[in-house]
Amino acid sequence: MSDTPFWQRKTLDEMTDAEWESLCDGCGQCCLHKLMDEDTDEIYFTNVACRQLNIKTCQCRHYERRFEFEPDCIKLTRENLPDFEWLPMTCAYRLLAEGKPLPTWHPLLTGSKAAMHGERISVRHIAVKESEVRDWQDHILNKPSWAE
């Protein structure tokens, strides 16, 4: 068996489902609601978290059954990855698709999510509960640094 990590020796298409899932750093950025301008198709990021997101841990409360609770939840696959142009520049799926390395704080490299939270990559420092928001437009973020 090779000492080279799977993400360095396999393409995204060659990865097992477990390997694919492990690429997610758990930052929660996918779980923040986005608004799209109907005229321009421009996407606006908000700090409004999906009802299923545990903001403290940045984990879905019902990940395996998330579509039962949130039918519009994102399902990122090998096939639809190109459709998600808004994925943050820090996203492992995006980085590997672009032939770039994982960031040094990535949980696959560090063994925990502490470095990711420490770098403020996760949304736990900006997210607000959907149930506490009246007007999502009041929660539009300037383009977040992780989206650039």
Swiss-Prot record:
Pfam families with a match to the protein in the record: CxxCxxCC (PF03692)
Originating organism: Salmonella paratyphi A (strain AKU_12601)
Disulphide linkage map: none
Family: Belongs to the UPF0260 family.
Residues annotated as transmembrane: none
Name of the protein in its database record: UPF0260 protein YcgN
HAMAP family reported for this sequence: UPF0260
NCBIfam families in UniProt: PRK05170.1-1 (NF003498), PRK05170.1-5 (NF003501), PRK05170.2-1 (NF003503), PRK05170.2-5 (NF003507)
